[in-house]
């Protein structure tokens, strides 16, 4: 491991980790941040180009590539981070994704191999603290406390949910069905899914953020740091298909999504709706207190070995 300075900024949702990373990056002459979602990379890109000259900022995702000739700052999905850049600052968001079955090997590769010349910053959940401290004993840990309170609201029918609510579903069919029900009962809802085109997805986010509609129906994509002005998050289901099988969400995943309710000093609430089974009192206490089981396993593929095999 390199001896360049590494800082891990860890804590639950709504703790300002991403904001800190952006401001820290811009304090250096050059930098890059890898995000878990295309939509989040685009959101941060739009914010940064309002602060500094657009010709200094690049956006690189699987869908969009805006790379000015003299770009100094690179905002990317983790998979799209260019590995040949020598930059002062490198950040990786939602670093606990190293434990994800599907994408974890990419995050772990960035954890092991991507370094800023002056500072590397890892942002994410406290659940990964112990395992990454074993990888490098010189990492500086910064703990961030949530700025607002998160409480359980129990079960509510969709017809009785309040405005500034996101309803979470785990299939396109369910997302569209719930959105149609809200349109009939409440007047309108925006939709956010990873499968939407960038233009459509950005337009749907703006539809909600501008106040044109009061409700959002989304997949668990919003759990990965997308900053929406939400007071409530309701789950229509606590099971998802993970690419291999239908499984229950673990408490950390529920907490990550539920934690999108409440912004800055405004408290948030989470609950369930429809046929979703009740969350136990014990689990509610753990989610409200952001107390989740620590990560014990990371996924990794030796990228150097893979490249060697491909060259043979």
Roles of regions detected by a PLM:
Residues 31, 96-151:
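Post-DEXD/H (motif II) to motif III coupling segment of the RecA-like Helicase ATP-binding lobe
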Residues 20-25, 102, 106, 112-113, ...:
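Conserved interdomain hinge at the start of the Helicase C-terminal
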Residues 46, 56-70, 177, 188-219:
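Conserved helicase ATPase core of P-loop NTP-dependent helicases/translocases
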Residues 69-88, 208-227:
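Conserved two-lobed SF2 helicase motor
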Residues 29-44, 120-123, 160-185, 189-193:
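Conserved strand-helix element at the start of the C-terminal RecA-like helicase core
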Residues 42, 48-86:
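Inter-Walker segment of RecA-like/P-loop motor cores
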Residues 116-130, 210-215, 228-295:
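Conserved segment of the helicase C-terminal RecA-like domain
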Residues 285-312:
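Long, largely alpha-helical accessory region at the distal end of helicase-like NTP-driven motors
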């Amino acid at each position: 491991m390199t001896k360049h300075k590494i800082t891990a900024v860890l804590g639950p949702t709504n703790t300002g980790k991403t904001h800190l990373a952006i401001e820290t990056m811009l304090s250096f002459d050059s930098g890059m941040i890898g995000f878990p979602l295309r939509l989040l990379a685009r959101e941060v890109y739009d914010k940064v180009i309002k602060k500094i000259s657009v010709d200094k900022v690049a956006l690189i995702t699987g869908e969009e590539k805006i790379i000015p000739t003299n770009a100094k700052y690179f905002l990317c999905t983790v998979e799209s981070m260019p590995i040949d850049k020598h930059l002062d600052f490198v950040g990786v968001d939602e670093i606990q994704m190293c434990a994800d079955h599907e994408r974890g090997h990419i995050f772990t590769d960035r954890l092991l191999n991507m370094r800023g010349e002056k500072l590397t910053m890892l942002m994410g959940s406290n659940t990964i603290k112990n395992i990454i401290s074993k990888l490098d004993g010189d990492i500086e840990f910064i703990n961030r406390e949530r700025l607002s309170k998160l409480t359980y609201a129990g079960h509510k029918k969709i017809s009785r949910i309040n405005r500034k609510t996101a309803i979470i579903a785990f299939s396109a069919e369910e997302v569209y069905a719930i959105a149609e029900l809200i349109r009939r009962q409440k007047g309108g809802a925006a939709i956010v899914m990873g499968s939407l085109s960038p233009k459509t997805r950005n337009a749907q986010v703006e539809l909600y953020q501008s106040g044109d509609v009061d409700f959002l129906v989304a997949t668990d994509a919003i759990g990965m740091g997308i900053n929406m002005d939400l007071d409530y998050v309701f789950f229509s289901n606590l099971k998802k298909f993970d690419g291999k099988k239908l499984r229950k969400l673990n408490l950390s995943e529920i907490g990550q999504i539920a934690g999108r309710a409440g912004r800055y000093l405004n408290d948030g609430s989470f609950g369930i709706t429809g046929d979703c089974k009740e969350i136990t009192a014990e689990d509610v206490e753990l989610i409200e207190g952001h107390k989740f089981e620590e990560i014990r396993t990371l996924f990794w593929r030796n990228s150097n070995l893979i490249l060697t095999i491909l060259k043979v």
